[in-house]
């Protein structure tokens, strides 16, 4: 197992960098994947499918008044169709004056369920896509309490944007 505080990155590693910003009292959240040099075809495919899952979620939100379950269902179908799983223990979230607000934006689920995403809402889409099981744990030795590891310790990938739902669909706030 690799601990973030002591790791030396090596050729083929994939890493996620997740950043939160606060501007004028409002939060935004984003993460990006990086490939160190050349990696295996499987890891590259994982990174690519995780990006595609983010874009699938965006497409579902191209019009307002969609359910969180619509978004989650589409992401889950895309990940599974490509042989990957979607983490269920972590989800996207509303953002605003607080870092984590309603709604919880699950990246799996059933169409027509969950909160309705309406104009004026700000939220993240951040599917964590795993090579193996969807189950994860938080590393007990992580001093920040936020190093997430897949239960089977196989590679994971995650991209994230913060969005504003408008009358015309989502606007990406974290380009």
Residue ranges with predicted function:
Residues 1-175:
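Active-site neighborhoods and metal-handling regions in enzymes and metal-associated proteins
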């Amino acid at each position: 197992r690799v601990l973030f505080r002591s790791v030396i990155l090596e050729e083929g590693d994939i890493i996620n960098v997740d950043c939160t910003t606060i501007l004028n009292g409002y939060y935004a959240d984003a993460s990006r994947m990086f490939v160190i040099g050349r990696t295996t075809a499987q890891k590259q495919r994982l990174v690519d499918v995780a990006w595609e899952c983010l874009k699938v979620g965006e497409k579902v939100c191209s019009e307002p008044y969609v359910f969180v379950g619509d978004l989650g269902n589409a992401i889950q179908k895309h990940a599974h169709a490509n042989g990957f799983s979607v983490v269920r223990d972590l989800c996207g979230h509303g953002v605003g004056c607080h870092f984590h607000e309603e709604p919880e934006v699950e990246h799996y689920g059933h169409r027509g369920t969950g909160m309705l995403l309406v104009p004026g809402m700000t939220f993240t889409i951040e599917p964590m896509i795993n090579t193996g099981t969807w189950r994860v744990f938080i590393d007990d030795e992580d001093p920040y309490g936020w190093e997430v590891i897949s239960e089977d310790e196989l590679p994971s990938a995650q991209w994230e944007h913060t969005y504003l739902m408008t009358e015309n669909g989502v606007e990406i706030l974290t380009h």
